[in-house]
């Protein structure tokens, strides 16, 4: 069936549509050659139409273990070519079969290069995937999409000797797995219930990734600041942005975001450059950072945006990139080790009211 990707400025791109005939969302692009299974199920992509830049997607199928959440989070997938005949010993579905199972539209044979050039030149915009480009209606994401992506109840993984509370704004499974692999017990706490950490009394806090505008979490910034002032904290992606906001900083939206597995980041402390996996639309405004409390630890090599912070007095650190990768390079996994070895030991006694 013929289908279209229609952008909010009226530009349309034709292709072949498989699945549900109509959906709307924010059109973004991912530049990685692999990792489509993790991308499709990453809660940070909640409500978005993902355009894959690599021309062939699905060649190794979909397996049962590399999901980042229990179901696809994207509104639709747009590719140049979807591979129907996958080749991998662990695969159980083709890309098309998996998306059909969840009624997620797949638009193929699209000139994805032209789509990306359009978004890159004009910025991220709302879009619809539809069987008819006439009269297409475009509805953007709700203001607080993290509310839809976070868990509804507290859960626990692992039984290690270090107890980490993972505050969930739409966390990736691989973040919890990375901590469990390092000997941690991980308790996932929905951000709406974050005050539960005072009863849990963990050794440390991790503020997770998540979708959408960090300012949509503004009503919780006071609680976030109180918690991270009492517990050693690591913020990842959205969690990093929330730490900056909690200490009086500001964030803004990039024209087309960082989404891929080859983003170079420099550590200002060691002068080392390493490749990172990233997925975000918003960044911290460097000019807004309170230099009396926070210092910039990492910068993006290409656009010099802020990629990580450290508190000057409290055991608090943050990164804009994804140290757990999945998908992407494992060069920054040491962030978890640094947090557990150097930040956690600085734990202060919880101040009881």
UniProtKB/Swiss-Prot annotation:
Concerning InterPro entries, the annotation shows:
Anth_synth/Amidotransfase, CarbamoylP_synth_ssu, CarbamoylP_synth_ssu_N, CarbP_synth_ssu_N_sf, Class_I_gatase-like, CPSase_GATase1, GATASE
Any idea which GO molecular function terms this record carries?
Answer: ATP binding; carbamoyl-phosphate synthase (glutamine-hydrolyzing) activity; glutaminase activity
Q: Which domain of life is it from?
A: Bacteria
Extract the ranges annotated as region (CPSase).
1-162
Q: Which residues form the active site?
A: 237 (nucleophile), 322, 324
Catalytic activity as recorded in UniProt: hydrogencarbonate + L-glutamine + 2 ATP + H2O = carbamoyl phosphate + L-glutamate + 2 ADP + phosphate + 2 H(+)
Question: Which pathway, metabolic or otherwise, does it act in?
Answer: Amino-acid biosynthesis; L-arginine biosynthesis; carbamoyl phosphate from bicarbonate: step 1/1
Example of a GO biological process term:
'de novo' UMP biosynthetic process
Q: Which NCBIfam families does this UniProt record tie to the protein?
A: CPSaseIIsmall, PRK12838.1
Q: Which HAMAP family match?
A: CPSase_S_chain
What is the protein named?
A: Carbamoyl phosphate synthase arginine-specific small chain
Q: Gene name on record? A: carA
């Amino acid at each position: 069936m013929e289908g279209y990707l229609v952008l909010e400025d009226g530009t349309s791109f034709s292709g072949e549509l498989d699945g549900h005939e109509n959906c709307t969302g924010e059109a973004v692009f991912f530049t990685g050659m692999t990792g489509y299974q993790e991308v499709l199920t990453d809660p940070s992509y909640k409500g978005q139409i993902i355009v894959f830049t690599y021309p062939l997607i699905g060649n190794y199928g979909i397996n049962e273990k590399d999901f980042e959440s229990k179901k696809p989070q994207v509104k639709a997938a747009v590719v140049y070519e979807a591979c129907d005949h996958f080749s991998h010993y662990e695969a159980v579905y083709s890309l098309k079969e998996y998306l059909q199972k969840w009624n997620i539209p797949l638009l193929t044979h699209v000139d994805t290069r032209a789509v990306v050039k359009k978004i890159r030149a004009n910025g991220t915009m709302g879009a619809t995937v539809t069987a008819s480009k006439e009269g297409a209606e475009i509805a953007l994401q709700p203001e607080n999409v993290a509310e839809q992506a976070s868990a509804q109840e507290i859960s626990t993984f692992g039984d290690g000797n270090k107890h980490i509370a993972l505050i969930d704004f739409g966390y990736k499974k691989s973040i919890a797995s990375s901590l469990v692999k390092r000997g941690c017990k991980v308790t996932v706490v929905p951000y709406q219930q974050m005050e539960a950490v005072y009863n849990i009394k963990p050794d440390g806090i991790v503020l997770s990734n998540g979708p959408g505008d960090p300012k949509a979490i503004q009503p919780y910034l006071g609680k976030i600041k109180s918690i991270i002032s009492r517990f050693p904290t690591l913020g990842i992606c959205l969690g990093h942005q929330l730490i900056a906001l909690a200490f009086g900083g500001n964030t803004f939206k990039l024209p087309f975001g960082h989404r891929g597995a080859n983003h170079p980041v420099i550590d200002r402390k060691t002068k080392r450059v390493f490749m990172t996996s990233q997925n975000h639309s918003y960044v911290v405004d460097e000019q807004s950072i309170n230099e009396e409390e926070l210092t910039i630890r990492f910068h993006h090599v290409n656009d010099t945006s802020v990629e990580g912070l450290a508190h000057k007095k409290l055991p608090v650190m943050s990164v804009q990139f994804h140290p757990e990768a999945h998908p992407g390079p494992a060069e920054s996994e040491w962030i978890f080790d640094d947090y557990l070895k150097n930040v956690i030991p600085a734990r202060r006694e919880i101040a009881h009211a």
